[in-house]
């Protein structure tokens, strides 16, 4: 009898869980994100054309002018969906990349490409970066058509390729070959954060107006290649290890732009003591207090990367047989530089840090060229600020320097202001999962983000 009751309870719980998941998936933004995650666009190879083909009929059904731009790589394509306004104002553009980074499948507890909805969370590669943002942007634009909002300007949605690397058909190619299709007065992309505190409430909304530059650095050590039974002092792998250890121990100095200072000021207002005091000291005039504040604030990886240039080894190469000492070993290192940084001076500093003339430090051109920060004095920025305040009362809304890079440079380099946001509230745990394992975003956050971006679009594009 007890077993029957237990089975009955388990059955009821299973039905309830299934019903809750179905209810969450019924939300249009959640449902769209699930569909997007199920299209595996890991880059390489990308296969972004599949996303364009998924979205095209949905936009067409709502009256959007839809164009699929095919790149020379048949697997890579861009969708441009335009909802026409009366033309009295120039277009506003929403841009989201369709590709995602790959996964370490054995470290996930769910299929990363199944779009699992569990416990009011959508799991899958791209849930945060950036198919979640794509779903929010797309649904907000679609809602304008569904609700027949009169528009003073065109609203353009773009799902582009190769943001995560792996090919040559990023927004730089798109702008060079098809600028007329994506020209706008201003644009919204990925970037800033809507961060929740421990109590689950949104503390701040940061809107990025600039990105760090990404600079690939190769560190190479040379030595004598010989039999592994006869090790020599000039072992290339040991030399590379010593060089990387020195780079790891080097703490780059604090560098603050106006956007960073505004952001940290906002954190000082929203944080409880003693963190509020540390944030004030970080941007204060006393260098001793600033250094101490840095030692505390920088325990948060996001804050550490925000206020300085960073050095991150990502790939190590060396050796090819167990019984051969290789003649060289190298490491790929990712440098992230704050706008205005002097790359030559920074490289000279790294050379002094390594302190070994036999170690070769070689950079290639920055992936994301530096451009001036986008102005905060635009209708789009003001509309996003207003929408954020309306959606998250009491939260600080502040400009922000994005600690990573985006593909916004294609527009910024042509004088088009671009603002960045991951348009859903997340917490520190969810942020860590981005590009990591069991990436997820909550269904409630997706709904809130869609409402916020819709509000923004009505204000900036609606006809008054």
Q: Can you describe what each PLM-predicted range is?
A:
Residues 176-192:
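A glycine-rich helix N-cap at a beta->alpha junction
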Residues 23-24, 192-449, 454, 458-464:
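Metal-dependent amide/peptide-bond hydrolase catalytic core
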Residues 89-156:
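Active-site metal-coordination/substrate-binding segment of hydrolases
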Residues 74, 98-100, 159-167, 190-195, ...:
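Acidic, glycine-rich active-site loops and adjacent beta-strand->loop/helix elements
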Residues 7-18:
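Bacterial N-terminal signal peptides
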Residues 1-3:
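N-terminal secretory signal peptides that target proteins for export/translocation
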Residues 23-105, 328, 332, 343-344:
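N-terminal helical capping/dimerization or prosegment-like subdomains
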Residues 30-36, 49-52, 56, 134, ...:
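Extracytoplasmic/secreted envelope proteins and their assembly/folding machinery
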């Amino acid at each position: 009898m007890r077993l029957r009751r237990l089975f009955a309870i388990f059955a009821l719980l299973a039905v309830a869980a299934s019903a809750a998941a179905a209810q969450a998936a019924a939300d249009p933004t959640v449902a769209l994100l699930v569909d997007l995650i199920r299209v595996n666009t890991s880059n390489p190879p990308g296969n972004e054309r599949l996303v364009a083909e998924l979205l095209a009929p949905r936009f067409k059904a709502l009256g959007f002018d839809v164009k699929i731009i095919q790149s020379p790589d048949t697997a890579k394509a861009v969708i441009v969906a335009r909802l026409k306004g009366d033309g009295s104002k120039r277009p506003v553009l929403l841009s989201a990349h369709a590709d995602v980074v790959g996964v370490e499948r054995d470290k996930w507890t769910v299929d990363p490409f199944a779009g699992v909805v569990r416990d009011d969370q959508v799991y899958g590669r791209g849930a945060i970066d950036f198919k979640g943002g794509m779903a929010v942007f797309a649904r907000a634009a679609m809602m304008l058509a569904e609700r027949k909002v009169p528009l003073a300007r065109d609203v353009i949605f773009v799902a582009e390729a190769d943001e995560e690397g792996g090919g040559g058909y990023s927004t730089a190619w798109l702008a060079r070959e098809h600028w007329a299709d994506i020209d706008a007065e201003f644009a919204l992309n990925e970037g800033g954060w809507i961060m929740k505190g421990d109590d689950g409430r949104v503390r701040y909304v940061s809107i990025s107006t600039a990105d760090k530059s990404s600079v690939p650095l190769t560190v190479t050590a040379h030595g004598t290649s010989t039999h592994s039974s006869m090790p020599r002092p000039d072992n290339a792998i040991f030399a590379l290890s010593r060089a990387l250890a020195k780079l790891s121990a080097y703490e780059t100095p604090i560098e603050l732009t106006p956007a960073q200072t505004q952001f940290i000021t906002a954190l000082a207002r929203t944080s409880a003591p003693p963190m509020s005091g540390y944030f004030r000291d970080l941007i204060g005039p006393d260098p001793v207090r600033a250094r101490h504040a840095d030692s505390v604030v920088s325990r948060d990886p996001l804050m550490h990367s925000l206020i300085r240039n960073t050095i991150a080894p990502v790939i190590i190469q060396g050796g090819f047989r167990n019984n051969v000492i290789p003649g060289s070993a190298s490491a790929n290192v990712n440098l992230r530089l704050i706008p205005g940084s002097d790359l030559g001076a920074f490289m000279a500093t790294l050379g002094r840090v390594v302190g070994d003339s036999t170690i070769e430090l070689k950079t290639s051109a920055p992936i994301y060229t530096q451009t001036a920060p986008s102005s905060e004095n635009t209708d789009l920025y003001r509309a996003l600020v207003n929408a954020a305040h309306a959606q998250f009362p009491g939260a600080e809304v502040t400009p922000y320097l994005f600690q990573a890079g985006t593909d916004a440079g294609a527009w910024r380099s042509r004088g088009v202001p671009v603002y960045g946001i991951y348009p859903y509230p997340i917490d520190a745990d969810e942020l860590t999962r981005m590009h990591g394992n069991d990436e997820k975003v909550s269904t409630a956050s997706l709904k809130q983000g869609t409402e916020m971006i819709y509000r923004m679009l009505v204000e900036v594009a609606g006809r008054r």
